[in-house]
Amino acid sequence: MKGKILIVDDNAGVLDSLDLFLKNKFEKITTLRNPNQILSLLGQDEYDIVLLDMNFTAGVNIGNEGLFWLRKILKTEPTPIVILITAYGDIELAVTAMKDGATDFVVKPWDNKKLLATLQAAMKLRESQIEVNKLKSRQKLIYQDIN
């Protein structure tokens, strides 16, 4: 699997585990503990997938921080695929995340095979989005040439 992934989680152990597990599966893996740096990183490089934790403040487990950053990420161009990850998953939070634009929702501790399948599906979706955008650009140029 090619592509670039940004993993955002306040837990260094989670970041290390994901980095180790995914290092041969992506061409670039960036890990980040502080979500305040997400938009800066997305402005510097084009990531295909963002794997985003839902909670960053100790003792807070309602997912509002993850939803906040999800909405911010989805306003960036080009828009990466966002998969949320949390230890405090519930159905209502997952539904809200999906309605807000997340592609998938993973609960910690994750199953490596399932996580990999989720990331592969996300990468295929991202590749499809890129191809659609290329076709739209070509179509626009053709229409401009005709007119």
Feature locations, PLM:
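Two-component/phosphorelay signaling modules centered on CheY-like receiver
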Residues: 12-30
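Short hydrophobic/Thr-rich beta-strand motif most characteristic of the beta2 strand and flanking loop
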Residues: 26-35, 41, 61-63
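Active-site beta3 strand of CheY-like receiver
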Residues: 45-51, 55-56
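Short amphipathic alpha-helix used as the core "switch/output" element in two-component signaling
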Residues: 59-78, 96
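A Lys-centered signature of the CheY-like receiver
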Residues: 108
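Flexible nucleotide-interacting loop at or near the entrance of a catalytic core
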Residues: 114-147
